[in-house]
Amino acid sequence: ECRLLRFEVDQRHFTAAPSQTDRKYPPGGAQMLINRLKKNRRILGRWARRGDISCYRIYDADLPEYALAVDLYQGDEQWAHVQEYQAPSSVDERRANERLEEALAVLPEALEVDQDRIYFKVRQRQRGRAQYEKFDTSGVFHAVSEGTGKLLVNFTDYLDTGLFLDHRPIRFMIGKQARGKRFLNLFSYTGAATVHAGLGGAETSTSVDMSKTYLDWARRNLELNGLADGRHELVQADCIDWVRRQRGARYDLIFLDPPTFSNSKRMRDHFDVQRDHADLLQAVSSLLSEDGVLIFSNNFRRFKMDTEVLPTMSIEDITAQTIDKDFERNARIHMCWKIVRKSLG
């Protein structure tokens, strides 16, 4: 539902640090932004280190006049991925641009990240194929750590980096539950959840996605973690058609994270998660083993779960368990359910 506008940040916005005698202090609002970023970096940094987390959201429009989401990524270097939320039409465009310039000017100092490692994007509401469009061809990937795993991210070529930070608790949950399990990852994207399942001891895994690009990315992630051993299958297919074609296949742990909307030309029909989730859940739940667990997540903010769709299943809302400290300000960034067969007792 978003469109990326990508452009080079004007070098003039990042001036060399002046001497104490010549220093021009930023406007009051920008100073407030600096203070908030430094405070968040101190508090969230301690939290992240305790949890073995190297990539996290440090700021999410905490100050309404600076409507940015700022994510820190740490690998062999440190990077910042900065997204501006598109201002509503009621906001004066000139003033919004001034605030953006103020924010861009103070980010290197406040984050302690080099200017050339700050990547800036603008998010706009967008439906359809535009949200999957490729925006650059740099092909530059960086390895970051998450728990015991390593994952590749790309800051320039796509709308997102290849790692949904808000899903971190879900990936950790999958890793803890995966030992000895047959794991199925539907709409698998870059395979980050599959990496966690593999490192957690999954017996086998199957990751299904329509995109060859993302499956190649997933393959590289598996190789990076020593998991390219034949037990982890990558399938390029329309997930919905693929699920319906399965006969007799059973999985002990399934992660289902469909898009909000898709009209990809590779899909037989357009997909709308609100309209189609009931049929999708019925089909996917049929692949569960007797004691299997289905984790269903989506990021449609107005989503309403049809709890009557699976009468033989127990459906538990576990959203609160899957929102980490760095996303508490945006607690509806996704919703998540745990689905298992009802006990006959």
At which residue positions do the language-model features occur?
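Conserved SAM-binding loop of SAM-dependent methyltransferases across substrates and taxa
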Residues: 190-202
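C-terminal catalytic and target-recognition region of SAM-dependent MTase-like enzymes
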Residues: 1-15, 293-345
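S-adenosylmethionine
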Residues: 1, 239-242, 246-316
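Conserved SAM-binding motif I beta-strand of class I
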Residues: 204-209
